């Protein structure tokens, strides 16, 4: 990344891979692939993966701790603009998260919209970020489209120390992005998955209460209750 503007990874492209690579380099094909792995900057960073917590200011003396290419990273000949992220309840145990995407370039292209879920506070230890879903869409120059994600119990549930799956008391945050490392539009959710829009203050939108029979609610730790 310090020596070139772009790097084309063809992986195992098959018998016609040479033609595909040539068409991409010549601009006849507009790529939109995203990395399914994280590429470390140095071997000392291994293991490195997208949902691993990296403490603030935890850099090496002569090297940043950020990976060379993070999970979900990718380039395109087109550019895209993200609108506001919206969340609403659709039914008793289904959440709809949507964002408007616009092609701001003069070329038709595909965009991979990625939704990441973060737990700000939870009753059990959670990864700092989890991929909640992704959509690949094709947009003409100037075209815009609303992209929606549906999140249910399966996407939002916790696993407790006994291996049970359920909805716990927690604070959520959603990111809609074109690639994993940056942060674009966000929505926050609070205890019982109370959805809020991130403004100058926390504005309550609705409270998510699962209706599925047998769904339990994890109790927060003692330290959380004392606060």
Predicted regions and their residues:
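Surface-exposed loops/turns
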Residues: 91, 141, 168-169
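Short, hydrophobic/aromatic beta-strand segments
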Residues: 108-115, 127, 159-161
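Short, intrinsically disordered C-terminal tails of secreted or membrane-associated proteins
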Residues: 219-226
């Amino acid at each position: 990344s310090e020596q070139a503007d772009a790097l084309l990874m063809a992986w195992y492209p098959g018998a016609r891979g040479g033609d595909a690579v040539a068409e991409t380099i010549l601009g006849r094909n507009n790529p939109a692939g995203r990395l399914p792995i994280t590429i470390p900057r140095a071997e000392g960073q291994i293991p490195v993966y997208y949902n691993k917590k990296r403490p603030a200011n935890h850099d090496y003396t002569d090297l940043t701790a950020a990976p060379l290419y993070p999970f979900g990273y990718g380039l395109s000949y087109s550019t895209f603009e993200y609108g506001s992220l919206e969340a609403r309840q659709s039914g008793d145990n289904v959440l709809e998260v949507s964002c408007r995407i616009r092609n701001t370039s003069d070329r038709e292209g595909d965009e991979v919209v990625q939704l990441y879920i973060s737990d700000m506070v939870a009753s059990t230890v959670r990864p700092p970020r989890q991929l909640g879903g992704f959509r690949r869409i094709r947009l003409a120059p100037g075209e815009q489209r609303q992209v929606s994600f549906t999140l249910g119990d399966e996407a939002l549930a916790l696993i407790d120390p006994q291996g049970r799956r359920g909805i716990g008391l927690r604070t959520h945050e959603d990111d809609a992005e074109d690639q994993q490392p940056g942060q674009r539009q966000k929505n926050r959710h609070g205890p019982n998955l109370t959805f809020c829009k991130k403004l100058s203050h926390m504005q309550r939108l609705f409270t998510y209460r699962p209706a599925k029979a047998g769904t339990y609610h994890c109790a927060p730790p003692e330290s959380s209750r004392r606060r």
